[in-house]
């Protein structure tokens, strides 16, 4: 359904006059920043284990065909790299990137920084802050993956408007 909105063009790769109608996949559209910041238009959502954009779209929008809206609203261009990995996918990824020994090695150090009611962890040099907590490569990669679990879903009352505007922009 995503590419249905894209324009088509005649393309002759061989240059012999036998052009074919193809979808112009080079066309790019981004969601307006102000639209993504409109909290009233979005519902926060935590991706469950093994959920795909299609599954979430089916649950939230009533059809798996709006998976591209889920992805576009969350700046996901490659589901294999930008989407949260399942436990099994994560284990496979970690073992392809690190040896068993490297998984337990220190990636960086962190200290808590508090401002008002909020505490965040910031990366620091261990030599500057001897009380800093070591974060292993495993912990670092798992935390990066977990950050991808929190997404925003476009509320259904705005879906028609969004798809119309997308169609106009493409």
Describe the residue ranges of each PLM region:
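Cell-surface/extracellular proteins and modules involved
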Residues: 1-170
């Amino acid at each position: 359904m995503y590419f249905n909105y894209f324009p088509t063009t005649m393309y002759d790769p061989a240059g012999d006059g036998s052009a074919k109608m193809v979808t112009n996949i080079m066309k790019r559209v981004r969601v307006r920043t102000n639209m993504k910041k409109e909290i009233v238009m979005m519902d926060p959502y935590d991706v469950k284990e093994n959920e795909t954009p299609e599954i979430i779209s089916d649950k939230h929008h009533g059809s798996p065909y709006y998976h591209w809206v889920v992805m576009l609203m969350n700046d996901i261009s490659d589901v294999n790299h930008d989407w949260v990995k399942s436990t099994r996918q994560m284990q496979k990824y970690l073992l392809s990137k690190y040896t068993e020994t490297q998984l337990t090695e220190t990636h960086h150090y962190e200290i808590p920084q508090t401002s008002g009611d909020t505490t965040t962890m910031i990366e620091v040099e261990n030599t500057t802050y001897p009380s800093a907590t070591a974060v292993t490569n495993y912990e670092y990669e798992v935390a990066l993956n977990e950050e991808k679990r929190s997404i925003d879903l476009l509320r259904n009352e705005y879906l028609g408007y969004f798809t119309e505007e997308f169609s106009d922009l493409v």
